[in-house]
């Protein structure tokens, strides 16, 4: 099965899911893949602040409420094949918008125009938005920050994703603290001195 729509989520805030989403999108665009990033973190988006000088750009929430068209909310990046749809203004009902038919239609249309649609969603450990979106997509990538997530919490988030029917494509382990080198440092030190 082809993978086109991919959700990127985490267990908690500040684990690097937005940065991971943007880096993956840039890498795919550099491979001449047409990529759309949708910022579906309508509750606490940071993507617009990092990627545009426009103040409060229209985005996903305006599209899903019918206030503007998709075309008006696509922002071109420095990469020819990479576009971003920002979250837009905070709506009173993000889960309702993401679980509705308009969002499903948006994904279907995006799949026709792009090779990959990467969807940045809120942390699944905080709200249910990620599971709602994951149920509509081809797969999910879970970003886990080293020493920030307890094992039990990670397992609970993975279970929520499985219950949503989402295929877990993989885990990105982020913010790994560089250690002393462990076993391999000792091995090479003894072997090559």
Go through the PLM ranges and name each one.
Residues 1-193:
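P-loop NTP-binding module
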């Amino acid at each position: 099965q082809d993978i086109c729509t991919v959700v990127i989520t985490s267990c908690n805030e500040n684990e690097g899911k937005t940065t991971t989403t943007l880096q993956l999108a840039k890498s795919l665009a550099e491979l001449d893949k047409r990529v759309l990033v949708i910022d579906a973190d309508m509750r606490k988006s940071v993507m617009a602040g990092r990627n545009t000088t426009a103040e409060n750009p229209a985005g996903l929430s305006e599209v899903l409420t019918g206030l503007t068209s998709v075309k008006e909310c696509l922002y071109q990046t420095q990469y020819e094949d990479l576009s971003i749809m920002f979250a837009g203004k905070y709506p009173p009902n993000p889960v309702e918008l993401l679980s509705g038919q308009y969002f499903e239609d948006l994904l279907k249309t995006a799949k026709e125009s792009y090779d990959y649609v990467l969807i940045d969603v809120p942390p699944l450990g905080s709200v249910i938005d990620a599971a709602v979106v994951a149920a509509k997509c081809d797969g999910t990538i879970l970003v886990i920050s080293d020493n920030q997530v307890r094992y039990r919490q990670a397992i609970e988030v993975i279970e929520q994703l499985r219950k949503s029917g989402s295929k877990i494509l993989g885990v990105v382990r982020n913010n790994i603290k560089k250690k002393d080198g462990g076993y391999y440092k000792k091995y090479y030190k003894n072997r090559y001195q």
